[in-house]
Amino acid sequence: MTIRKARPSDIPVLNELLQDILQVHHQARPDIFKSEGQKFSEAKLVALLENPDKPIFVFELEGQVVGHLFCEFRTTSGDVLEPIKTLFIDDLCVASSVRGQKIGEQLYEFALSYAKEQGCHNLTLDVWADNAGAVRFYERQGMKPQKFRMEQIIS
């Protein structure tokens, strides 16, 4: 088991895992998410891999990439906000073939340790309210709601 920075050679597997996430989101919210498509083009993924503010990590099991962790450093600013450095988890995904082996927990713990090493105040992420499994997973990791985004569908 290894968690390491993603490399350009990982792009095909990253895209497969991103497709898994898209399907989960499409099933929960087909009014928002398309049934197919790419979140990032190959060129965009290459650029992300080179961006130190948006690190991407992969989980290798027996030489195969079976999970990923897309992160982003964010800093709050403004007249009423304290300047806080945050590590935001944009995507955390584990291949369905290896779920239940605590790989998600290991990726999350890695993100938490990485955030501490980088001097972050907190670790944050967004999770869709309809994704009850993900909500439970993150609550088990110790996360608590920071705020709620509400919606009323008009059409």
Where do the language-model regions lie?
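Conserved GNAT-fold acetyl-CoA-binding loop/helix
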Residues: 22-45
